[in-house]
């Protein structure tokens, strides 16, 4: 079983093969997802909401993410493992380097940062220090209070243009992957075409290079509500393994997400 690497993901984009991704937080589920053929696993700061029961992700610490990264890594043989850098753990380049080192030591193969051009120095510095970086634009949950809630981003022309330019700048600075969350399908498609790196969407329509969902949403077991962009695969299949396999299959063949799970301008 050949391991997924940054080179694998880039080749998948170049060959128009969709990338499948899910969040994971422990060894049991990471093993289950890995065995079904998931390409990417993200230890998301979403753990603050789905595991810790909080209303947002802001209370998650770097130690929380490192703990779950160690657990996830133990269940994985093939999938590419990414760890979120949580709120205020990367405010300065120096702080970013130290905290990224903790996540890489815990078993991550890449770290994910939320934000735009203010991160360029940190992105370049991480690359120089051997740490692969995933960017995250659109609805960045750590900025929920700035946005005034969990809202679709990039619907007006100015905001869309700014997001496109920031994606280009971050790619030039050295990110090797980009997550777009809750942005209109047209914008997500334009960004995916404008950068050479793989773009993975969540609530960003079918035109990105891949899809990611929070595992609890994909299984329909989130405590609060089911986001518009998600789909309850466990309800459809009645079995966790089959649910994961169907999710992967629908991402690969392009049937998920449909228009019903996407946002328009």
Curated annotation (Swiss-Prot):
Example GO molecular function: 3-methyl-2-oxobutanoate hydroxymethyltransferase activity
Note on how the cofactor is bound: Binds 1 Mg(2+) ion per subunit.
The name this protein goes by in its record: 3-methyl-2-oxobutanoate hydroxymethyltransferase
Family stated for the protein in its record: Belongs to the PanB family.
HAMAP family named in the record: PanB
General function of this protein: Catalyzes the reversible reaction in which hydroxymethyl group from 5,10-methylenetetrahydrofolate is transferred onto alpha-ketoisovalerate to form ketopantoate.
EC number: 2.1.2.11
Subcellular location: Cytoplasm
Transferase listed as a keyword: yes
CDD domains referenced in this protein's UniProt entry, alphabetically: KPHMT-like
InterPro entries: Pantoate_hydroxy_MeTrfase, Pyrv/PenolPyrv_kinase-like_dom, Pyrv_kinase-like_dom_sf
Residue positions of the active site: 181
Keyword Cell membrane belongs to the record: no
Reactions catalysed: 3-methyl-2-oxobutanoate + (6R)-5,10-methylene-5,6,7,8-tetrahydrofolate + H2O = 2-dehydropantoate + (6S)-5,6,7,8-tetrahydrofolate
Keyword set, alphabetical order: Cytoplasm, Magnesium, Metal-binding, Pantothenate biosynthesis, Transferase
UniProt-annotated binding residues for 3-methyl-2-oxobutanoate: 45-46, 84, 112
Binding site for Mg(2+): 45, 84, 114
Pathway terms, separated by semicolons: Cofactor biosynthesis; (R)-pantothenate biosynthesis; (R)-pantoate from 3-methyl-2-oxobutanoate: step 1/2
Gene3D superfamilies assigned to the protein according to its UniProt record, in alphabetical order: Phosphoenolpyruvate-binding domains (3.20.20.60)
A Pfam family annotated for this UniProt entry: Pantoate_transf
One GO cellular component term noted in the UniProt record for this chain: cytoplasm
Cofactors named for this entry: Mg(2+)
Subunit structure: Homodecamer; pentamer of dimers.
Lineage: Bacteria, Pseudomonadati, Pseudomonadota, Gammaproteobacteria, Alteromonadales
Any one of the GO BP annotations: pantothenate biosynthetic process
